[in-house]
């Protein structure tokens, strides 16, 4: 399944995945079914995250549209649950860990397990970990509640530790990096992992992306900027589009050099390319022509350019 004439990442394959999304979606089949049926997974911000009514009440001077944009999102239920002892983490340290770190441990391991690998198979191997990670809400929670800070707070809220913790727990000694390019962080992490495989820096890489919303700050800022939907719904490529809806998520996949695996593969990775918009209408606005060139570059790497 290698693309004819491909010169880049065409010898890489995906061998295992793990996912946890709103709507109690915990596997690829459930995700595909949700997409096929159009089931909605967005809704009002749950009280377990923050007091949305209080946040809206303190923002009424900003107008009805901004207040409505602040009310909605898509949230993972029971994101705080974690089997700490399975990963050799004490209850005290687990309590001080960003839920995003816990989810990365769970789904990084589950993706490797889905690839047929055990803890014994992984320890001491030069496998890579590449994590797309942008949200820093847990650190903000600690800032807002000084009494909750303790000996594990620094590592529990650190971005760099989020990727390093999986390598530490599983004994992985390959490249380990956290990539923050906002909403493209997961795709950028995939591109970096593919390049590492191509360069021989590792023969296997775990790619993860995670986002868990815990405080209202970013919600409010995006509502003010008009980025988020008034009705809490995404209408992509649709005349009804009026913004997007922020969401929790965690996903992981395992990429390997194709020659190192047998027939069990989910996807062949034919080509990747990573670029930046450069100058556009504003700092956060997309650049259509730059995105077109990015797609053309990835197709060329895959040997599939027309």
Question: At which residue positions do the language-model features occur?
Answer:
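Condensing-enzyme catalytic core of the thiolase-fold
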Residues: 1-306
């Amino acid at each position: 399944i290698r693309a004819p004439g491909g010169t880049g990442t065409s010898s890489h394959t995906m061998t295992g995945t793990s996912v946890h999304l709103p709507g109690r979606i915990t596997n690829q089949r459930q995700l595909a079914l949700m997409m096929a049926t159009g089931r909605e997974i967005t809704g009002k911000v749950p009280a377990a995250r923050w007091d949305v009514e209080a946040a809206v009440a303190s923002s009424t001077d900003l107008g009805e549209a901004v207040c409505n944009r602040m009310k909605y999102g898509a949230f993972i239920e029971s994101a705080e649950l974690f089997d700490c002892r399975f990963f050799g983490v004490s209850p005290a340290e687990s309590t001080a860990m960003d839920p995003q770190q816990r989810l990365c441990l769970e789904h990084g391991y589950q993706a490797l397990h889905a690839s047929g690998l055990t803890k014994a198979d992984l320890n001491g191997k030069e496998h890579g970990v590449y994590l797309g990670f942008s949200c820093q809400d847990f650190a903000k929670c600690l800032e807002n509640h000084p009494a909750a800070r303790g000996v594990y707070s620094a590592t529990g809220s650190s971005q760099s530790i989020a990727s390093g913790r999986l390598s530490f727990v599983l004994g992985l000694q390959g490249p380990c990096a956290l990539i923050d390019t906002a909403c493209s962080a997961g795709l950028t992490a995939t591109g970096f992992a593919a390049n590492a495989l191509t360069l021989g820096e590792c023969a296997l890489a775990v790619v993860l992306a995670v986002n868990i919303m815990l405080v209202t700050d970013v919600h409010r800022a995006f509502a003010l900027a008009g980025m988020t939907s008034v009705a809490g719904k995404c209408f992509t490529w649709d005349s009804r589009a009026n913004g997007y809806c922020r969401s929790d998520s965690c996903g992981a996949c395992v990429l390997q050099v194709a020659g190192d695996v047998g027939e069990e593969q989910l996807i062949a990775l034919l080509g990747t390319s990573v670029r930046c918009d450069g100058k556009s209408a504003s700092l956060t606005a997309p650049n259509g022509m730059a995105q077109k060139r990015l797609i053309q570059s990835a197709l060329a790497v895959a040997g599939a350019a027309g």
